[in-house]
């Protein structure tokens, strides 16, 4: 806190018997010119000093003892930084008292003193102006003109001093007022820069988001989508597998064929006889099947390995037109051949039977109907027929050599000329002619044309006679010819030259008992047989069907024998 003593005023009068107490040191301390010597006071003009006012401390008592006006002001600029300006105008009127003749000459002018006090603290009691008048009892000296001049000069000096100090103070405060707009401008600039930086950041963020979206779009547009269409090879494989599945699961007993109009040029026995077939231009053709087949019996149709497409027999005229015969071909496409030529067969284990069928249901019906003598008991069967057959694997390429050695014969040649069936090498295969040297004329010869191959559909329960596969004697257990028959539907070809038929119905019935050769599939190779499952010793073979009490538990439950392990 800075305190200044603003003014000290000397007394305008003089006291009797002495001069005023030295105000020169105080004025000199304030930088004011020292007042001149005051004249001596009149002996009768002295008055006692007034007592100090109430509530004043020692400072007021000291001020009262001195004949001057003390004005004290205090300012606090460091703590508050701002203050209130208050101008106080103090009017001091002093009326001299003394001799009567001096009162007329010594009229005192009113003196006006301007004092500026800056008060920075409202709570400070010392920052108040205190006016200490000289009092009415004081007498002025006798020389009024001189004192008035001195008082006027002192007043002017004080006024100029106060004005100069105010000007300095205002000049020191002006830079702060000038700096305030600059600070505001700087704040505005910083705010603008912040705004611009925020805008730039937002633009960068939006640009980055746009770039990311563009990148995503580019990546998604460049994804290689695999083609939805399958290749031709895959489609072919799908067709092949579908054909295989349909072939294995189908239960239709008949081969579909368009209605065939029998040729009127043929004899009646040829029309009404067993279904016949003829080979012409590499295709096997056949007529509609007779009533020998039972449509209700489930059996798969001709598989891809069994037959080529059949067509109806062409007229025996020499002027046959191939275009007319081609119209009778089946609408079904040529089935593809399966890669796997192995097929599971079921062999009858009854003594001196050895029948082989391609379905378990067929072999069971065969055993029930032929060997056990049970007809129509398939639903109520006790499962005894399961012990009389076993599974074998047969290669369907076994009949390759059989058809390769057979030359196709046209119907006109077969009707007009002698039998044209070639006899293959006996060292390589067994032919029907080699086996039928002792019996050239059989009941079958009455029911077939000269060299045409009879084709008939047969099923398991009809006990189709054994079919001889050429060159298969080495695979049979007893050294005799190994005979198999197919259920889908077995087709019997007889290559024995015979005379025209006389008894078609009887011959067709006897055909099932005396046929010698059956070729059921296009030839592709040799026969390879897996070791049959039932060839080893088993409880039912060792002890027989009569002694089931001696069988092992596995055999009782129709499982693999655990007592006689292969």
Swiss-Prot record:
One GO term (biological process): regulation of transcription by RNA polymerase II
Spans annotated as Sufficient for binding to RE2 sequence motifs: 471-566
Major subcellular site: nucleus
Subcellular location: Nucleus
Biased composition (Low complexity): 12-31, 56-72, 267-290
In-chain residues carrying the UniProt-annotated modification Phosphoserine: 378, 381
Region of interest (Disordered), residue spans: 1-148, 166-203, 253-324, 409-436, 497-535
Result of knocking out the encoding gene: No visible phenotype.
Acidic residues: bias regions: 101-128
Key words of the record: DNA-binding, Metal-binding, Nucleus, Phosphoprotein, Transcription, Transcription regulation, Zinc, Zinc-finger
Ranges of biased composition (kind: Basic and acidic residues): 91-100, 186-203
Biased composition (Pro residues): 32-55
Xref: PROSITE patterns: ZINC_FINGER_C2H2_1 (PS00028), ZINC_FINGER_C2H2_2 (PS50157)
GO MF annotation list: cis-regulatory region sequence-specific DNA binding; zinc ion binding
Keyword Amino-acid biosynthesis applies: no
Chain positions of motif CR1: 537-541
C2H2-type ZnF: 346-371
Domain remark in the UniProt entry: The CR1 and CR2 motifs mediate sequence-specific DNA binding, and are important for binding to the MYOD1 enhancer.
Function of the protein: Transcription factor which binds to RE2 sequence elements in the MYOD1 enhancer.
Descriptive protein name: Zinc finger protein 704
Species this chain originates from: Mus musculus
Source lineage: Eukaryota, Metazoa, Chordata, Craniata, Vertebrata
């Amino acid at each position: 806190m800075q305190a200044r003593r603003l003014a000290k005023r000397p007394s305008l009068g003089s006291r009797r018997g002495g001069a005023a107490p030295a105000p020169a040191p105080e004025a000199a301390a304030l930088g004011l010119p020292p007042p001149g010597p005051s004249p001596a006071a009149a002996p009768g003009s002295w008055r006692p000093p007034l007592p100090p006012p109430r509530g004043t401390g020692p400072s007021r008592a000291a001020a009262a003892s001195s004949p001057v006006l003390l004005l004290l002001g205090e300012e606090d600029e460091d703590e508050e930084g701002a203050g209130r300006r208050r101008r106080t105008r103090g009017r001091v009127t002093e009326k001299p008292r003394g001799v009567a003749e001096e009162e007329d000459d010594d009229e005192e002018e009113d003196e006006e003193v301007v004092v500026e006090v800056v008060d920075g603290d409202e709570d400070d009691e010392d920052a108040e102006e205190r006016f200490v008048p000289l009092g009415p009892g004081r007498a002025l000296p006798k020389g009024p003109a001189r004192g008035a001049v001195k008082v006027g000069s002192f007043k002017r000096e004080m006024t100029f001093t106060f004005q100069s100090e105010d000007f300095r103070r205002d000049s020191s405060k002006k830079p702060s007022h000038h700096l305030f707009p600059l600070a505001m401008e700087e704040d505005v600039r910083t705010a603008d820069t912040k705004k611009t930086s925020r805008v730039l950041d937002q633009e960068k963020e939006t640009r980055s988001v746009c770039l990311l979206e563009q990148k995503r779009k580019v990546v998604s547009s460049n994804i290689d989508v695999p083609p939805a269409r399958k290749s031709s090879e895959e489609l072919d494989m799908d067709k092949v597998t579908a054909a295989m599945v349909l072939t294995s699961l189908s239960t239709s007993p008949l081969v579909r064929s368009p209605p065939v109009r029998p040729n009127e040029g043929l004899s009646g026995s040829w029309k009404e006889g067993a279904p016949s077939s003829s080979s012409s231009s590499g295709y096997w053709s056949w007529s509609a099947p007779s009533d020998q087949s039972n449509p209700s019996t489930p059996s798969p149709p001709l598989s891809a390995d069994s037959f080529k497409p059949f067509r109806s027999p062409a007229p025996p005229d020499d002027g046959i037109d191939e275009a007319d015969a081609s119209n009778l071909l089946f609408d079904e496409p040529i089935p593809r051949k399966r890669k796997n030529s192995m097929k599971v067969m079921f062999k009858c284990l009854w003594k001196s039977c050895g029948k082989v069928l391609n379905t378990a249901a067929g072999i069971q019906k065969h055993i029930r109907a032929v060997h056990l003598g049970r007809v129509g008991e398939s639903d109520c069967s006790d499962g005894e027929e399961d012990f009389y057959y076993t599974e074998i694997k047969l290669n369907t390429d076994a009949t390759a050599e059989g058809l390769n050695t057979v030359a196709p014969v046209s119907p006109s040649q077969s009707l007009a000329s002698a039998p044209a069936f070639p006899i293959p090498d006996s060292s390589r295969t067994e032919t029907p002619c080699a086996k039928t040297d002792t019996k050239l004329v059989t009941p079958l010869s009455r029911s077939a044309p000269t060299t045409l191959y009879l084709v008939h559909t047969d099923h398991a329960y009809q006990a189709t006679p054994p079919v001889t596969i050429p060159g298969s004697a080495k695979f049979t257990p007893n050294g005799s010819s190994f005979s198999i028959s197919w259920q889908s539907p077995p087709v019997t070809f007889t290559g024995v030259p015979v005379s025209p038929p006389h008894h078609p119905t009887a011959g067709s019935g006897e055909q099932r008992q005396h046929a010698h050769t059956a070729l059921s599939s296009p030839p592709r190779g040799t026969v390879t047989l897996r070791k049959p499952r039932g060839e080893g010793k088993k409880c039912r073979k060792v002890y027989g069907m009569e002694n089931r009490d001696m069988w092992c538990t596995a055999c009782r439950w129709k499982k693999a024998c655990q007592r006689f392990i292969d």
